[in-house]
Each structure stands twice: as C-alpha cells, then as structure tokens.
Amino acid sequence: VNVLESAEELREKGLAFSGSAQSELATLSDAVREILTLAQTSFIQQDVSSALQVEPLEQVIDALKEKMRTRHILRMQQGQCSIEAGFVWSDLLTDLERTSDHCSNIAGCVIDAAQHNLNLHETLHAIRHSDENFQRRFRSYLEAYSLPTLPSM
C-alpha cells in the first residue's frame, strides 16, 4: 500500500525521478521481487533451501538502500533531482527495505520450524555469522544487484 501511495504522490505532484534514479530503483525492485518469491516458496513449500537464500539477499537489499540514499543526495547536490522527489524516494526505499525485512522474518520462521527452534533472532544471527554458504550467496547477490558505476564528476 505504501509503495502505491508513493506512486500516486509522484503522479499527483507531477514529480519524476531522474533516469539514474529510475535505473537504481529497477535494480532494487528486481531484488525485492526475488526475495518475495524466495520467501513465498519457502513458506508455502516449507522449503529450507529457499529460506536460506533470503537472508543474504536481505542484507544486499539493506546495502542497496543505503547506497541509493547516498546517490540521491549527490544527485540533489548536482541539481539532477528535487528535494520534493527526494522525500518520496526516501519513503519508497524504506518501504521496499521493510518488505525485505518481512521476507527475512518469514524465512527465519521456516528455518526455525524445520529445526524445532523458536528463537528467530538467534537463527538469523547464526546464519549471518557462521555459514560459508551465506557469504557465497551474499557475494553472488551483490554482483547480481550491483548499481551502475557513477559517472566521474
């Protein structure tokens, strides 16, 4: 719903994101679509393999959000994007990142259920810090969802 509200706000106010921002948003949207699919598959099929792919992608989405916020500030400083569009941009990034957080929680619960464990935060911490597969998947997702290089200034 919040994403729809952001789109409506852009339309109603006649705002638009720059081409660079649109390209970045497409990358983030692709990552969020993938994490939604993984979380849905893990939940419906109780598929731990899919669930284990969610957390590294969620961490990449967190990093993307921060990088995209920084890049938007640079675009505003260069006059490529407006402050008003920046408010919508910030809301949109937060909403998409929050969606990935929910997916992480769903996948974590699937893993917990399979292990007969009831401590989601402990499970997610263990996945992030002690699993070599996590690091491999994380690097793979970083590569798959990398943002284009900024032009030199």
Where are these regions (language model features)?
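Cytosolic, long alpha-helical scaffolding segments
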Residues: 1-153
